[in-house]
Amino acid sequence: MEMKKKINMELKNRAPEEVTELVLDNCLCVNGEIEGLNDTFKELEFLSMANVELSSLARLPSLNKLRKLELSDNIISGGLEVLAEKCPNLTYLNLSGNKIKDLSTVEALQNLKNLKSLDLFNCEITNLEDYRESIFELLQQITYLDGFDQEDNEAPDSEEEDDDDEDGDEDEEDEDEDEAGPPEGYEEEEDDDEDEAGSEVGEGEEEVGLSYLMKDEIQDEEDDDDYVDEGEEEEEEEEEGLRGEKRKRDAEDDGEEDDD
């Protein structure tokens, strides 16, 4: 399938300015040149044209937002200065499996100031003595060459980098929320709840206290009643005793009169 047809198929009824990623791998470049891609793809951030028999970048449109460019397994041998002119914000460039042979060809990438990762794997240039040291010296802005930095530490996967960025954004949002504190009125509501709870407890204690006092009063009244009852019984017993003595004296007096 030709590149122009492949582009139309990948659009899927979208306008070119709505596309941020475009994969055109394994299609065919007529005469080894880019066709069907133009300046209307101004929002493009990722472009892949791997194994499309591309030999020239002369017809590459201006893509100022492009960050990642995949050009592996083509027949590019030069003309890399176009990249700095058309895609000045590139951070990742894959030229592995192309016809790049010498350092002078790569030197054109010095003007890509934001370039961090470059792949030249399976290019003839990798057979040069001190290849890695020479590239890092020539392109001092890059961090990773063929997937590794100067200390042979492997480059993070691009998807992991994206995830880290998202996690970083979420952490920042959480920190912002923590710094902002609780929403307005939140503390006041808590205080109101505590006051209500306190008043409920106070009312409960008052009710318990009242009931306790009422019980004491009732008990005191009962005790007073018992005391009154006991007093009345004692008075009755005393009165009966007095009446008994009086009857006894009356009987004795009657006896004395009979004797007379």
From Swiss-Prot:
There is a cross-link at residue 68 (Glycyl lysine isopeptide (Lys-Gly) (interchain with G-Cter in SUMO2)). One of its GO terms (molecular function) is histone chaperone activity. Residues 149-208, 218-240 have a biased composition (Acidic residues). It holds the Pfam family LRR_9. Residues 207-260 are annotated as: ZID domain. Residues 149-260 are annotated as: Disordered. Residues 123-161 form the LRRCT domain. LRR repeats lie at residues 18-38, 43-64, 65-87, 89-110. Residues 241-251 have a biased composition (Basic and acidic residues). Keywords: Acetylation, Chaperone, Chromatin regulator, Cytoplasm, Isopeptide bond, Leucine-rich repeat, Nucleus, Phosphoprotein, Repeat, Ubl conjugation. Phosphorylated. The phosphorylation is nuclear localization signal (NLS)-dependent. Expressed at highest levels in cerebellum and spleen. In the cerebellum, expressed mainly in granule cells and, to a lesser extent, in Purkinje cells. GO terms for cellular component: cytoplasm; cytoplasmic vesicle; glutamatergic synapse; nucleus; postsynaptic density membrane; postsynaptic endosome membrane; Swr1 complex; synaptic vesicle membrane. The modification N-acetylmethionine is found at residue 1. GO terms for biological process: chromatin organization. InterPro entries: AN32, Leu-rich_rpt, LRR_dom_sf. It is found in: Cytoplasm; Nucleus. Disruption phenotype: No visible phenotype. Mice are viable and fertile. They display a subtle neurological clasping phenotype and mild motor deficits. Motor defects were not confirmed by a subsequent analysis. Deletion in embryonic fibroblasts results in the appearance of a significant number of new H2A.Z/H2AZ1 around the transcription start site as well as at other chromatin regions. The H2A.Z-interacting domain (ZID) mediates a direct interaction with H2A.Z/H2AZ1. Belongs to the ANP32 family. Component of a SWR1-like complex, composed of EP400, KAT5/TIP60, TRRAP, BRD8, RUVBL1, RUVBL2, ING3 and ANP32E; the complex does not contain SRCAP. Interacts with H2A.Z/H2AZ1. Interacts with the importin alpha KPNA1 and KPNA2. Histone chaperone that specifically mediates the genome-wide removal of histone H2A.Z/H2AZ1 from the nucleosome: removes H2A.Z/H2AZ1 from its normal sites of deposition, especially from enhancer and insulator regions. Not involved in deposition of H2A.Z/H2AZ1 in the nucleosome. May stabilize the evicted H2A.Z/H2AZ1-H2B dimer, thus shifting the equilibrium towards dissociation and the off-chromatin state. Inhibits activity of protein phosphatase 2A (PP2A). Does not inhibit protein phosphatase 1. May play a role in cerebellar development and synaptogenesis. This is Acidic leucine-rich nuclear phosphoprotein 32 family member E. It comes from Mus musculus. The lineage of its organism: Eukaryota, Metazoa, Chordata, Craniata, Vertebrata. The gene is Anp32e.
